[in-house]
Regions:
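Alpha-helical transmembrane segments and membrane-interface helix-loop junctions
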Residues: 1-133
Length: 133
């Protein structure tokens, strides 16, 4: 189980860096046929979609973990569960015996890092479109 969680964490950690460097797997059949201006528009569109996905993932993680509600209940897990019917903080892993939310924390981390990288890439793409780079 530890090996599985380690592999999942490494995948999410490297995915953010790969997307920042624009080295992800991509199908470039259409963009290769476009002129330079068209390619720039495709890059901006892709960067926009990545950023929108990342922001949606941040929002979903916020709703999943519900940190404000947890704080409002005084970090009392039972009170939190009773108020929200969200059992994220109570479920244990099968063999390690740790709370699963610790293993799942990679998802909000990835969402935040992807959002930051998405903003950076989009700004870079828009700047390149204006011919400043």
């Amino acid at each position: 189980e530890l090996a599985i969680y380690a592999m999942i964490w490494m995948t999410f950690l490297i995915a953010g860096a790969v997307l920042k460097r624009r080295h992800g797997i991509a199908v470039t059949l259409v963009s290769d046929l476009l002129p330079s201006a068209g390619r720039k528009w495709v890059i901006v569109a892709v960067d926009t979609m990545v950023l929108l996905f990342a922001l949606m993932l941040v929002w979903l993680c916020w709703r999943w973990y519900q940190p404000l509600t947890l704080a409002q209940t005084g970090f009392d897990i039972r009170a939190f569960q009773g108020q929200t019917f969200n059992f994220i903080y109570a479920e244990n892993t099968s063999t390690l015996g740790i709370k699963k939310f610790w293993a799942w924390l990679i998802v909000p981390w990835f969402a935040i890092s992807l959002s930051l990288h998405g903003v950076s890439n989009l700004v870079q793409s828009l700047t390149a479109m204006r011919g400043r780079v």
